[in-house]
């Protein structure tokens, strides 16, 4: 079956997922990493990005004048935040934007019920990840935009497998950056450095969160968006903010269990979910519907 991953959400979202299921697939909204999170979250991964950049620069023997790590250091040390504002704006305008759906390795977790499961009135959708493609280190750059990827979030660090892949991608782009300068000279060198730095952050930032969130044990389903592709980006309003998203489909066969939160009337909710599965010609015998074991009443 593979490892299990859990998505805490509301009853409203569950109804929408099941009602709109097509071709035995559930359609999730993958939100832009930059519109759903604190836009300065990428700074938490400063050391990781710096380490990758400096190792690539050492391997490629990059001169001090062309080093992108120098720009990253200047932005990090800028007390006025002017550099950070320029970088944030460039990230929003970047051609390659990461969109994510959040999961957790924790099943039936009280903190996650409170944070993401409508304070105990929602559901926890338990999926097997075996049909979700992981990162493929071979030929990753062309493939990264053609499929979805699942990986562990790091809290102050990242896993070695992701680190190795990100290292390869950054080195590939760094070579293109140096080749462009070799062919065209150092005109617009700042813009070229900023573009490569943005790419490094776009690759690394989705898997980095502040250590205070380590209790979530998050895994993220990631999809990159290219502006020139045929992917459609849409928008919704949440908490007085406008969030951009793109659609990601997960096979219904991945859904193994629906845990009903500790607060609702379990029998009533369970019967309704079973009826809905039948109405959508989905086999409820393949999906367990169970009650949360968390002793919590809001």
Predicted segments with their positions:
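Partner-binding and oligomerization surfaces adjacent to conserved cores of proteins
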Residues: 1-298
């Amino acid at each position: 079956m593979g490892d299990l991953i859990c998505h805490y959400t509301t009853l409203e979202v569950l109804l929408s997922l099941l009602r709109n299921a097509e071709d035995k697939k559930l359609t999730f909204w993958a939100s832009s990493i930059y519109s759903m999170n604190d836009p300065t979250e990428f700074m938490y991964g400063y050391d990781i990005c710096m380490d990758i950049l400096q190792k690539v620069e050492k391997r490629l023997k990059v001169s001090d004048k062309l080093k992108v790590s120098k720009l990253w250091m200047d932005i990090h040390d800028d007390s006025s935040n002017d550099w950070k504002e320029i970088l944030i704006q460039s990230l929003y305008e970047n051609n390659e934007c990461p969109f994510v759906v959040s999961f957790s390795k924790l099943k039936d977790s009280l903190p996650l019920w409170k944070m993401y499961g409508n304070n105990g009135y929602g559901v926890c959708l338990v999926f097997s990840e075996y049909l979700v493609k992981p990162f493929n280190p071979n030929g990753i750059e062309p493939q990264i935009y053609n499929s979805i990827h699942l990986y562990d979030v790091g809290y102050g660090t990242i896993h070695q497998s992701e680190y190795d892949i990100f290292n390869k991608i950054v080195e590939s782009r760094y070579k293109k950056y140096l080749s462009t300068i070799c062919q065209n000279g150092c005109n617009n060198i700042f813009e070229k450095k900023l573009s490569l730095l943005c790419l490094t952050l776009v690759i690394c930032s989705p898997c980095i969160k502040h250590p205070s969130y380590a209790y979530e044990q998050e895994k993220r389903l990631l999809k990159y968006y290219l502006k020139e592709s045929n992917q459609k980006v849409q928008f919704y309003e949440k908490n007085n903010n406008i969030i951009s998203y793109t659609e990601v489909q997960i096979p219904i066969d991945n859904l193994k269990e629906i845990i009903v939160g500790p607060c609702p009337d379990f029998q009533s909710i369970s019967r309704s979910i079973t009826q809905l599965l039948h109405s959508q010609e989905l086999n409820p015998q393949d999906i367990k519907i169970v009650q949360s074991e968390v002793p919590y009443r809001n």
